[in-house]
A protein has these predicted regions:
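Edge beta-strand at a domain terminus
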Residues: 120-122, 130-144
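N-terminal signal peptide c-region/cleavage motif recognized by signal peptidases
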Residues: 15-17
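Bacterial N-terminal signal peptides that target proteins for export
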Residues: 1-7
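Acidic, glycine-rich flexible loop segments
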Residues: 104-120, 125-126
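N-terminal helix-cap/turn-to-beta initiation motif at the start of protein domains
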Residues: 19-29
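Central antiparallel beta-sheet cores of small beta-barrel/beta-sandwich binding domains
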Residues: 27, 35, 42-103, 110-111
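Short acidic, glycine-rich loop/turn motifs
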Residues: 32-34, 102-106, 127-131
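Generic beta-strand structural signal
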Residues: 43, 92, 117-118, 142
Length: 144
């Protein structure tokens, strides 16, 4: 009887630890799916944000920095893509970072987004319009 309780306690403890995630596990640098950029995810107040911290090709062929030329807000189109905040306003809820948005500097479009942890070094980033079923998911890996 005591042996069964010990096993049950162990299994209960183990299952809770496996399925619970710390809200700050997402913090750090992540390599995007294309391998073109590192995104630094950080906490600002109670929300999570992400900015482009490194780019494989940060400059144009003429040596000038790549700019956010496709931004629909003309006052922002002269900003450098390096350092650009592309993930905004995420909150942690039910093991998912949600309620935020992702900006794509290649198209100048912003999408609703949610992020889920797939392991200590992998996240799935899902951008969508309207319903999350209508979107695209990318896997990002942690930069070590």
């Amino acid at each position: 009887m005591m042996y069964q309780r010990l096993i049950l306690t162990f299994l209960l403890f183990f299952s809770v630890n496996v399925f619970s995630q710390s809200k700050d596990q997402i913090l750090g640098k992540w390599l995007n799916a294309s391998g073109e950029a590192h995104i630094q995810i950080y906490l600002n107040g109670s929300k999570y944000f992400g900015k482009i911290a490194w780019m494989k090709t940060p400059n144009n062929p003429d040596g000038s920095p790549r700019l956010d030329k496709n931004n629909p807000n003309s006052s922002l189109s002269s900003n450098s893509i390096l350092g650009l905040v592309i993930l905004k306003d995420f909150v942690f809820n039910d093991n998912i970072w949600q309620g935020g948005s992702i900006y794509d500097p290649k198209t100048g479009k912003t999408y609703s987004c949610k992020i889920s942890l797939q392991g200590p070094d992998k996240i799935n980033v899902r951008g969508f319009v309207g319903f999350s079923m209508l979107g695209r998911t990318e896997s990002w890996t942690r930069v070590k």
